[in-house]
Amino acid sequence: MAIGVPRPLAIEKPQAVDLVQAARYFGAHGEPDAATLALLQKCAVPLLAVAMPQAVWLLADTPALTEAGLLPGEDVHKHLTGCGQAILLAVTLGPGVDAQIRRAGVGDIAAGVASDALGSALAEQAADAAEAQLDRKS
């Protein structure tokens, strides 16, 4: 098989951003305080509005991935020890999210950092949804 053909994977936009996860990315330990939660809630609305999650995946023989230079570093090799094949998954929220993060940070550094944390949480949610789709396919 070597390296398979990339295939698109339809994923839906989450209804909301996981604010607790976003708060962790923002640097909060434990439950976020009211001010942090309010900032995240405020910044989540425009970020979610522009998000357009998309995913692509492929199945490949792990030796072919190594030969192609797609698995740099030793840690990934340790994780894949004994695996003949691996699924590679890529997820994006689209360019609108990056633009919104930049807009939010103009004149308000905290809003920019909060938006970045929200984008990370939303990307993780999209990746989880894509992984669930792949699980249903197998």
Q: Where do the language-model regions lie?
A:
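Active-site helix-to-loop segments that bind/position phosphate- or nucleotide-bearing substrates
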Residues: 1-115
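Compact, glycine/acidic-enriched structural inserts
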Residues: 110-132
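Conserved small/polar residues in nucleotide/adenosyl-binding loops
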Residues: 138
